[in-house]
Structures are given as structure tokens and as C-alpha cells.
Amino acid sequence: VSDLYDERETVMRSLGREVDVVQSSFSTPRWGDACQKLRIVNVPFYIDVPRTSPLARKSRITVADLEGMRLRVLRHGNDAMDSLRIDLLADGGVDVIDVDSFDFALFNEAEEKGDAVLTCGAWSGVHPAFVGVPFLCGREVPVYLHYPLEPTLQVQKFVNAMAQLLN
């Protein structure tokens, strides 16, 4: 399966060929109408901070807590993240640093510079030098089950069963 952040051939464009379904948030600029989607859950944003940061001891982080800090944000990570990124840039109190993907190199560099990273919680606890703290920003990230535009009968039955469970 292709790298999720490879613009030439994304996982979403591999649906129906290499994979049947994918659980993920959604990025309109990256995936457009490449697949169908079924909303399964909403998850909160997290701010991943170095364990040595004073913010690491907080139970929640607000925009005010981030004033004057550098915050790494995945560009086109998902539509909700893009919207939050625009608001943070407009506010001007947080130095937003665009990144292209999440990997250990990103977190290593962020730790060296004392930067925070905006995530949906999936990276929380993955890098040993970081802790994820819920971000009170008034929005959540919808997570979807993505499936092909023309699913096989088995995939459509699975999607229908998921939809029934979610209702």
C-alpha cells in the first residue's frame, strides 16, 4: 500500500484494489471524491508536547496556553485540522509551522526546539519524549470508514452492517 502522504498514489486511491476499507479522518484537498465515507466517531484534538514542557502536566490545553509557542500542524491532515490551522493563523498568537507528515524525525526535531504538535491523539504515547494533552478548541475531528466508489458486494455488506451498528 502506498504511503498515506504520497501525492502520486494515496491509500484512498488504492481502495478497491489494494485495500477494501480504511479508517481515517478526511482531507478534501488530498482525497477529494476518491472514495465514499461513513462517519463512525468524532475524536478530540490533542497537543503533543515534550514531557519536559510545563504544558505536559496540564489536564487540558487551551489556545491561550499556546500563546507565543511554535505549533507544528499537518497541512491537509484532515478538514477539521485545516480549519483549526486557519483560525490559529488568523489569531496570530501561535507560531504555526506547517509539516507534511508525522514521523519520528518530526517529533525528534520538535523536542529539540521545544515545539508542540497538533494531533488527533493517534501519536500520543508513540514517541517516548512526548505526552498528548487534550486541546480545548471547541471542535473535534470526524473519523470515517472510507470505502471504494464502487465497492464489491462484500464491502457494501460490511459498510451496511457498520451503518446499522452506528445508528
Task: Specify the residue positions occupied by each region the protein language model found.
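Beta-alpha-beta core module
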Residues: 32-38, 42-43, 105-154
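Short beta-strand-to-loop elements that line the ligand-binding cleft
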Residues: 1-6, 73-74, 92-104
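Flexible loop residues that form catalytic
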Residues: 27, 76, 122
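Flexible hinge/capping segments at coil-to-helix
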Residues: 34-45, 49-71, 156
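Central regulatory/effector-binding core of bacterial HTH transcription factors
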Residues: 1-29
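Alpha-to-beta junction loops
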Residues: 14-24, 45, 94, 110-118
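Secondary-structure junction motif
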Residues: 31, 69-92, 155
